[in-house]
């Protein structure tokens, strides 16, 4: 016999075979097993399924108490005695004192004190001990397993009750479900993650299987899209499936991706599970005021984040900066925030210690955003977010020009979602637009050197329309937009932008800017096939002494590009230019410059009959460039490398018609047909 407090049969479980086996194994060897996880992840469903199987195999009963919705006075202790169905007078009379012994001060029934004040009733150890003994005896006779379900609103009270029960009977088995652990030494915690949407390329995961039980297996790509938008949350999937009564699956996929499932509603056994909003609101009500503010302000962060970024966004007059880290950990403990990277890790490239990183799941983020908007704080939080991203971009720019460019690349990759949001969210005013433009300009190396040219141009073209005031920042943005246009072989657009940038640089007496403009013109002329004009522009750029080495390609890069331009024409001058490039470097960790210099040497040696030396230089250039990216350059080097290997093995190949076409136009091995594509996002 299984005594469920709500008398419902245990439900079926989808996609929890591993967790089911894990909980079953722990239940056989440990007295206390706690299932934790975010709201709606399926903790109660799995616990009931495991206990149903456990009692079917081993006999016995299950005493379930729904701590969130099933308590009607007296707390979990009295509810547990009621679930046991005790008719014994001693048990009934001692239930209330036991409840008082395990209750938080001020939670249980209050008694009047002097001057009309209220106080907690005095504990009654003898009666409490009697009730515990009676309950323990009942559990031994019936071989009962206790299930304290949804303990969050009375978690401390449940922890004291569990501790007393295990002291009374160490052989007792107790299963707890809550958004956070009880924190007892005897406790073994199983944390439930959302269901996987896919298990590999083309393989649907359990989240899709769960949705397909309602929709059928038609249009699997739409099922995957819906489950990805819902982040694999079982409750969100169930509520979304209920919407199919009033809309088609394609409509559901479009709506859930744009609007989110926060206010989807459907039938449920508890009020908390009738919508994601209700589920999140229940947890929000249990948080302290500080934790609520931090939760709401974190909702402006679209991606994962570290404590520094969280502090920038959340700290204010009502939330001290020192309090943010503690709030993050408390929110993580109750499964509002996910920790996606533990603290204490080591950067694989630099060996530097890595901070933890967190993530706010979509349901919690949508709920927090609604609370932020209701409190009238959304505008201020968004402004703080963009300012923090501007600081991140500036830090990345300095790291790029410093001793290790990989640090800059990793920083931008880690903060990709946040930087993208800071660049694309509509600015609130002119000052906010300048902040977004500053981010785009600071990330010049990401666009120009790491292969994201198309994205960079799109951001700059849009933001330049919003920032019309003639400032030094706008002058840099104009140069960068023209430089990217030249790299993408858009000569007309590049010419117009660089002309405007030249006027602004003259107005601001920016000699560094004039040198960068000459460098960009050289790129334009090289891709246009006018080597003489490119050499002239690069010679002008190399005569300049940079005053600001922290922005843009400096004289060293102009020397390296000059070596590439001269490689097929004048070997001695090309070698000299490559040497000057490395001599005038700003940092030994400039892999962008190093790979360009090596590639120039490879082209020079190849053009002047030294294929073996060219092969060595080309291979080193490829390895250096791989450290920072840029697929077009990498593809070009690989193409050159393949030709050099063929030459070394078999001698020079007979020329063909295609040899007259530059590699960036015809494409090397594995390159798309269109020129200067942008690097694909990881996992896309």
Range-by-range predicted roles:
Residues 294-298, 365, 386, 392-396, ...:
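Short, well-ordered secondary-structure microsegments
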Residues 3, 199-200, 215, 219-223, ...:
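Loop-to-helix "switch" segment enriched in basic
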Residues 437-450, 475-490, 513-530, 553-569, ...:
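Tandem amphipathic alpha-helical repeat scaffolds
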Residues 24-29, 40, 49-60, 100-101, ...:
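A conserved switch/coupling segment of P-loop NTPase cores
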Residues 44-51, 162, 280-383, 387, ...:
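C-terminal boundary/linker of central alpha/beta nucleotide-binding cores
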Residues 1-25:
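Conserved adenine-nucleotide phosphate-binding loops and their immediately adjacent elements
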Residues 4, 16-18, 45-46, 75-82, ...:
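Alpha-helical sensor/transducer elements of the RecA-like P-loop NTPase core
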Residues 99, 124, 201-208, 212-213, ...:
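A eukaryote-biased feature capturing mid-to-C-terminal, repeat/solenoid-rich segments of large proteins
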